[in-house]
């Protein structure tokens, strides 16, 4: 599975309405935060997460929505397993619903489930084929040639390599359709964010969800080092992937002893060696009875510090742009496709850890946790996020992997 629990958040800052006669404005930041946890078995193969039965697994038989795609909105003339997108906003330059479109691809697998219902569904064979790649290259050339001030514009198609396409979602404070009851506990946990409702043609949910079956393998390899002895357990952790991995935790539990090794980053093709006995954590209680301060500091608290955006730990509550970061001439036909980083808001990270800290750090034996590089996520799970000319997307993607040996 591409993501055993992922959450992506789009957070829109409050915007102060401008007079209708204003000739120009700065587009409001729409912060897109995607996160996910990918679980691997001892042999490095992905593990399947628990999905709610209300998620879709087949395209709709209803006629497609008549709402025009977000990418066709006028430009301003003056973004794998269980990803979810949550949206927050204190308001925008317009008073109505916020239009958003999402396209997701999976370069190493096939989409399995999604919600709300998509407008378009392509198989992996089609989306990852040579013809789709060529069509995408042509699309990128056409996007680059767009002239924002042109009065006559030729419409652009969406990304032909996307497997799941939502052309015209709307974000509102209240749901436009009755939400479906979920039968997976984690769904209710991540509905409780006070986020905007995401409305499709016939369904409303607190998030956009997508999941795929992929052929990805764990990026790391753990072997004994050349100085290994029973009382001096020397291990080497090698990154065999093409991208760096970050925030690497190796937690080993044996009887009443716990060891935690941490590496801030391991570049592609490089290794990190450690002696297990040098990383014993003192004052540790059994996980079921609660965690002692030293253990929490070495695990959950440390990971939290690495993931929370210290400069912006909470969503914006007012318009936050200045002359230095003013974005103008926005064209809805041009999506945001590249992540600018990985750090999230504190409540997002706390929710991830509330669900996953026991799996990350409380399992018997050896467990390895690491953060995937945003560039890897952009390649393995291409994400495009469109919005109107009054907003611009700032994308962050957090991918965590947990490997239980």
Explain the meaning of each model-derived region.
Residues 23-405:
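Protease-labile, long low-complexity intrinsically disordered regions enriched in Pro/Ser/Thr
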Residues 17-21:
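N-terminal signal peptide c-region/cleavage motif recognized by signal peptidases
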Residues 1-8:
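Bacterial N-terminal signal peptides that target proteins for export
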């Amino acid at each position: 599975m591409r993501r055993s629990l992922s959450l992506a958040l789009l957070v829109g800052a409050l915007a102060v309405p401008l007079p209708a006669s204003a000739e120009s404005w700065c587009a409001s930041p729409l912060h897109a935060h995607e996160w996910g946890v990918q679980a691997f078995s001892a042999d490095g193969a992905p593990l399947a997460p628990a999905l709610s039965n209300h998620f879709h697994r087949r395209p709709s038989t209803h006629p497609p929505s008549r709402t025009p795609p977000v990418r066709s909105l006028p430009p301003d003339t003056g973004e794998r397993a269980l990803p979810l997108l949550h949206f927050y906003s204190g308001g925008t330059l317009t008073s109505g619903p916020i239009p958003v479109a999402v396209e997701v691809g999976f370069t190493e697998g096939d989409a399995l489930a999604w919600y709300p219902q998509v407008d378009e569904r392509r198989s992996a064979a089609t989306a990852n084929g040579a013809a789709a790649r060529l069509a995408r290259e042509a699309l990128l050339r056409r996007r680059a040639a767009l002239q924002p001030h042109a009065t006559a514009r030729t419409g652009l198609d969406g990304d032909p390599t996307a497997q799941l396409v939502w052309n015209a979602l709307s974000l509102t404070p209240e749901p436009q359709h009755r939400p479906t009851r979920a039968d997976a506990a984690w769904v209710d946990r991540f509905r409780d964010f006070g986020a905007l409702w995401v409305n499709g043609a016939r369904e409303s949910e607190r998030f956009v969800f997508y999941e795929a079956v992929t052929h990805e393998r764990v990026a790391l390899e753990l072997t004994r080092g050349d100085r290994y002895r029973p009382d001096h357990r020397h291990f080497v952790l090698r990154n065999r992937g093409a991208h760096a991995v970050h925030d690497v935790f190796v937690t080993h539990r044996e009887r009443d002893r716990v060891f935690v090794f941490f590496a801030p980053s391991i570049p592609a093709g490089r290794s990190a060696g450690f002696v297990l006995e040098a990383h014993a954590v003192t004052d540790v209680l059994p996980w079921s009875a609660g965690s002692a301060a030293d253990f929490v500091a070495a695990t959950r608290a440390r990971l939290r510090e690495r993931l929370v955006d210290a400069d912006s730990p909470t969503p914006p509550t007012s318009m936050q742009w200045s002359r230095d970061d003013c974005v103008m001439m926005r064209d809805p036909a041009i999506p945001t496709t590249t992540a600018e980083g990985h750090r999230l808001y504190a409540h997002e990270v706390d929710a991830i850890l509330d669900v996953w800290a026991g799996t990350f750090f409380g399992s018997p034996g050896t467990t390895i946790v690491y953060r995937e590089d945003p560039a890897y996520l952009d390649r393995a799970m291409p994400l495009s996020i469109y919005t109107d000319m009054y907003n611009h997307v700032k994308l962050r993607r957090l991918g965590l992997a947990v490997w239980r040996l």
